[in-house]
Amino acid sequence: QRQMCIRDRHIGSGGSLTGPMMVLKALTSYQTPHIQIDFIGNADSSDLQAKLRKLDPATTLVVIASKTFSTQETILNAETMKKWMLERLGPSSLSKHFVAITGNKNRANSFGIVDENIFEIWEWVGGRFSLWSAVGLTIVLGIGSENFKEFLRGARAIDEHFQNTAPEMNLPLILGMLEIWYTSILNFGSRAIIPYDHRLQNFVSYIQQLEMESNGKSVDKLGNKMTKKTAAVVWGAEGTNAQHLSLIHI
């Protein structure tokens, strides 16, 4: 069995971690045979060390996703993986077993990653949307290129729906207006996401990060202090596990 340890963390917000994690869990039934993907995001080394004990360096690919290639947590875990690999396979392992997804090619080169193993992302790509960019390499490894293309076609379909559909039938617009109504007008401060499919268990953390980073602002574009709430606290749990959170029923 071919094992791949995917080390994936977005600068500051975790977008390139939560996105691929959510998608790959949701599309488990499309998983590429003989490829095992592990996500390493926390600076606490216990998770990484536990995974390293199970890995064969000869069959391990390390994908480092960082827009600036300077995030402390990212580089800390990347350096640990690098040391582990060099001790077992020597200097040549860097060109064979390490891939970077970044907007800072020079820093990736300085780390030891060769040009042909660097997938560049544009400056305007935010981490919370990065799963549609080169960060999606992790998803390609997990479900295969054809399934990933189908995934992109689905994303394009909803983009075109948003751009071309009249307001009264426009799903993203309606959901956005409802969010403003409940959060900024009715002043609700909490929103629970409860997916009733086990494969969507990571959807909660993805939406939490997506919305609370995008809309969680205390000032407007001109620097003026906001007088209304801009976002609710997003939380939740998987399916019937959430029924034991008694407060949600009150």
What are these model-derived regions, one by one?
Residues 13-17, 43, 102-106:
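Short glycine-enriched loops at secondary-structure junctions
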Residues 2-6, 250:
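Short, small-residue-biased leader/transition segments that mark boundaries at the very start
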Residues 8-22, 129-136:
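Conserved phosphate/anionic-ligand binding catalytic regions in large, soluble enzymes, centered on
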Residues 7-12, 62-68, 190-197:
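Short glycine-rich or small-residue beta-strand-to-loop segments that form or flank ligand, phosphate
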Residues 23-24, 29-61:
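Glycine-rich oxoanion-binding loops at beta->alpha junctions
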Residues 19, 23, 48, 64-67, ...:
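Extended, hydrophobic alpha-helical segments in both membrane/secreted and soluble proteins
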Residues 77, 84-248:
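Active-site phosphate/pyrophosphate-binding segments
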Residues 14-18, 22, 41, 50-52, ...:
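Conserved adenosyl
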